[in-house]
From Swiss-Prot:
This is Putative elongation factor 4. Belongs to the GTP-binding elongation factor family. LepA subfamily. InterPro entries: EF-4, EFG_III/V, EFG_V-like, LepA_C_sf, LepA_CTD. PANTHER family: TRANSLATION FACTOR GUF1 HOMOLOG, CHLOROPLASTIC (PTHR43512:SF4), TRANSLATION FACTOR GUF1-RELATED (PTHR43512). GO terms for cellular component: plasma membrane. It comes from Streptococcus pyogenes serotype M18 (strain MGAS8232). One of its GO terms (biological process) is translation.
Length: 174
């Protein structure tokens, strides 16, 4: 919400806004610097606390909650932020031997989901031609092994994943 707009001289403007602190944390500084090519600066003061509808968003990797990726977001923007973060994490987290679901959840409700596909070895490479039942047996054996790995496997989260949660730029939507 804009409060004042003062022209200091021909090249400088002083604009005073009231913005929620959460919006400043999520990529405001980077957007300000990139849109002004580094010329703008900002200073902030805490004006007051206001009641708002906030929710805690948890990020689940392979069904396990990652506390370091949890954050508080306004209820109105929860779906969009969850979708952006899930897509970013899908690009950053390396593929595993098993399929890894990435979910954004508010309480028990899943608001966004994406899957990292599993790496697969071509088990049919040594089967030339013929027997369909042999091929099916090999694929079923691989499927059972992947299911077993998924049950006991854990996912390593790279360091840049934690930093990417804080930057909400538009390239995640592409």
């Amino acid at each position: 919400m804009k409060q004042t707009l003062d022209y200091i001289d021909d090249n400088r403007v002083n604009v005073i806004y009231q913005i929620p602190l959460a919006e400043i944390v999520f990529d405001f500084f980077d957007k300000l610097k990139s849109s002004t090519r580094g010329y703008a600066s900002f200073d902030y003061d805490m004006s007051e606390y206001r009641r708002s509808q906030l929710v805690k968003m948890d990020i689940l990797l392979n069904g396990d909650k990652v506390d370091a990726l949890s954050f508080i977001v306004h209820k109105e923007f929860a779906y969009e932020r969850g979708k952006i973060i899930v897509e970013k994490l899908k690009k950053i987290i390396p593929r595993q031997q098993f399929e890894v679901p990435i979910q954004a959840a508010i309480g028990q409700k899943i608001v966004a989901r994406s899957d990292i596909k599993a790496l697969r070895k071509n088990v049919l490479a040594k089967c030339y031609g013929g027997d369909v039942s042999r091929k099916r047996k090999l694929l079923e054996k691989q499927k059972a092994g992947k299911k077993r790995m998924k049950a006991i496997g854990s996912v390593e989260v790279p360091q840049e994943a934690f930093l990417s949660v804080l930057s909400m730029d538009e390239d995640a939507k592409k």
